[in-house]
Structure formats: C-alpha cells, structure tokens
Regions:
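Polybasic/polar functional segments that serve as interface/processing modules
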Residues: 2-46, 55-88, 103, 114-124
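C-terminal structural segments of small proteins and small subunits
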Residues: 89-114
Length: 124
C-alpha cells in the first residue's frame, strides 16, 4: 500500500511538471479563460482535471490541436471528444481537460463536482 501511494505521488509530480510548464501555457496562449485545475484523489482514471472556457468552436478546435501536438511530441497518448459541440474533453496521461463555451459551463456546472478536490491553480 505504501509503495502504491509513493508511486501515485510521483505520478502527480510528473503530471504537475508536464502540466504547469506546458499545458497551461498552451491554454493561456490560446486565450482560454476561467481556467481551473483540480487535483483529483481516489480516482483511478484522472489525477488532474482542468476546466476552461473558450469563446467559440474555432478557438476550441485550435486549442485542442495545439495540445495534441504538444502531447504527441512527448510520445503520450491523446484522446479528444466533442469537438463540434459546446463541450469538448481531452484526455492524456491522467489529465482530463474540459473545454466549455461560457453558456455550456454554466449549464453543466462541472466546477461543483470538484468542490472537495484540491484547487491547484486558477486563472481568470
């Protein structure tokens, strides 16, 4: 059990380094707004969840393409879904990123699902 916890902590550290140095920079350069990142504990699928707003589907697609290029350059698996809607999900290496239009974010209100999670960062 202790070994598993140590491995999980190391995984979070690796994600944090990759995450803070690269992923958030892409979101900011792509002018995504209201960015929140949560550290998710006791979840076998995600270690980090990021939620952000975009102004249009074009901005969403562009942001996802830039992230895909970054993630693939690190030889990581990348998955995206919902590119033609008001809510898209990107997944890679224990990180899930939800892109919302402002209206969709208010409607689905995912932020409240993570009220008990550690808020790692917030922009805007």
């Amino acid at each position: 059990m202790v070994t598993y916890l140590l491995m999980a902590e190391e995984k979070i550290k690796d994600i944090n380094n990759f995450f803070f140095e690269n992923v958030i920079d892409v979101l900011l350069v792509q002018k995504c707004t209201n960015i929140k990142a949560f550290e998710i504990k006791n979840n076998s699928y995600f270690d980090v969840i990021i939620i952000c707003n975009v102004n249009s589907n074009i901005q969403m697609s562009s942001s996802i393409k830039k992230l895909k290029k970054l993630v693939k350059s690190k030889n990581k698996n990348f998955f995206s879904e919902g590119l033609d809607s008001s809510w898209a999900l990107v997944e890679f290496e224990g990180v899930g990123i939800h892109f919302f239009t402002e209206e969709a974010r208010e409607y689905y209100n995912l932020d409240d699902l993570f009220f008990d999670s550690n808020l790692m960062l917030q922009y805007g």
